[in-house]
């Protein structure tokens, strides 16, 4: 589900769907496609959605990699990762929804913060999140012991 949500938000940026408040606040029709895609995680709400997506990728990796572990231990690891995921999902749902709508829709967006209009935005947050969020797996293993 987070992958679908992330792809829908990315599509909203690609299509310049300014009825989505997050898109209207972080993009405009003159922004190059490269930066529109990078803008998906360029602010708080999209960044949290990327965080949840990466957490799910790590969780699936732990589930696949943990098949050889004792069943009870593996269940505890999956349970801890599930609780972490539920916490982030609740946070994004109640405080940072990237799909809030603007009614009426904006004619054009505000633009991505000029400081973020750098090619590094395309790789820095995803790589950073794969490292940060990856620590949820050893945390889950430590709690499961």
Across the structure, where does each feature detected by a protein language model lie?
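Polytopic transmembrane helical bundles with strong interfacial aromatic enrichment
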Residues: 1-145
């Amino acid at each position: 589900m987070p992958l679908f949500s992330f792809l829908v938000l990315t599509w909203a940026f690609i299509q310049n769907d300014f009825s989505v408040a997050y898109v209207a606040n972080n993009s405009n029709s003159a922004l190059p496609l490269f930066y529109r895609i990078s803008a998906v995680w360029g602010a708080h709400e999209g960044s949290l959605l990327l965080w949840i997506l990466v957490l799910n990728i790590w969780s699936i990796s732990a589930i696949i990699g943990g098949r050889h572990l004792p069943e009870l231990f593996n269940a505890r690891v999956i349970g801890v990762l599930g609780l972490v995921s539920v916490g982030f999902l609740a946070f994004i749902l109640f405080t940072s929804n990237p799909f809030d709508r603007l009614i009426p829709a904006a004619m054009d967006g505000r633009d991505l913060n000029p400081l973020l209009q750098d090619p590094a935005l395309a790789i820095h947050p995803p790589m950073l999140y794969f490292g940060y969020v990856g620590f949820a797996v050893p945390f889950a293993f430590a709690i499961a012991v």
